[in-house]
């Protein structure tokens, strides 16, 4: 994969809308030989994000929806830290002029267990957890090891690997070398605990349609042929 492109995509996908997005990138699996370089670049990009007033054109991340939600997000990170995970970027609420708001720094977590809550649960905050994988089989298995299945992305220069990932990752939307953009012509919906049905595209029409079956018989006989199974004609 292109580490620079993947790092930018991961950071933007994790913190867009404050991470308060159903399709946000909340966890990433990086091939082991690229792990250190990728996490270092992600941390660098996160540290460079300007947190503050969303009306300021220089701001890259504004406030979360409420103080209660900010505290919930911080709780995930604090518990991960207490369980032995490493926080390579963020992990704190900014002070100074922003101390009174519901702000939280873009956060990068590594060293978390696959079955930990920060990997398995939806955080809805600007938090990205990164874990290594050694083979495509393992990477796809880890990606699918979650109760959710709304969105995923695969970052690779190899066409065959991208086709395999997009086919085998159990998510309703899979991007290749991007994350987040959605167009109205394409269906949007998930698998597993992410629900069923689709919005957007022609598939969404069914979600707004009450389908009714009306059948009128033109057979005037009192005894219909299909009723023979009940009335047992001799």
Ranges and model annotations:
Residues 50, 77, 100-234:
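Conserved C-terminal structural/oligomerization subdomain of aldehyde/semialdehyde dehydrogenase
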């Amino acid at each position: 994969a292109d580490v620079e492109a993947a790092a930018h995509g991961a950071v933007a996908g994790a913190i867009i809308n404050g991470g308060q997005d159903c399709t946000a990138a909340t966890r990433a699996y990086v091939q082991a030989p690229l792990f250190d370089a990728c996490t270092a670049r992600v941390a660098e990009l996160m540290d460079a994000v300007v947190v503050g007033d969303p009306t300021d054109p220089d701001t890259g991340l504004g406030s979360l929806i409420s103080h209660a939600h900010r505290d919930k997000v911080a709780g995930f990170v604090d518990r991960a830290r207490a369980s032995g995970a490493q926080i390579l970027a963020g992990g704190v609420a900014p002070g100074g002029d922003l101390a009174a708001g519901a702000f939280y720094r873009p956060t990068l977590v590594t060293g978390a267990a696959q079955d930990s809550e920060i990997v398995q649960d939806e955080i809805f905050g600007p938090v990205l957890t990164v874990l290594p994988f050694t083979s495509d089989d393992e990477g796809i298995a880890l990606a699918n090891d979650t109760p959710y299945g709304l969105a995923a992305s695969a970052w690779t220069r190899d066409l065959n690997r991208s086709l395999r990932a997009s086919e085998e990752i159990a998510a309703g939307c899979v991007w290749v070398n991007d994350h987040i953009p959605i167009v109205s012509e394409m269906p949007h919906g998930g698998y597993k605990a992410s629900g069923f049905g689709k919005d957007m595209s022609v598939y969404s029409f069914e979600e707004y349609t009450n389908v009714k079956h009306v059948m009128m018989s033109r057979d005037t006989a009192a005894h219909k042929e299909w009723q023979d199974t009940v009335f047992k004609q001799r």
